[in-house]
């Protein structure tokens, strides 16, 4: 079974985001819901950003829950969001309309497909 390897699930609110993520930092996130029967987090969208706090606040009201993890570098965040995107169904199952983009001015490859070959 695929794993996000993230902390949470937390309520997606400005208050909770500020409580958990107190400074601008690189990382990954997943947005979703809690399944009523299983009580498990259901991934609906995955992303990454260099400022998790600000980015997550842009999603408040779109999904009720979020998970997150810090990344050691931009490249690590990119590789993780690609893995999460593929592991959780890509555009067929997630709200992501496109494969995650790599940062400008990089030649990084997706670790799961040949999108950038």
Question: Could you say what each language-model-derived stretch is?
Answer:
Residues 1-44, 48-117:
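Boundary/linker segments flanking structured domains
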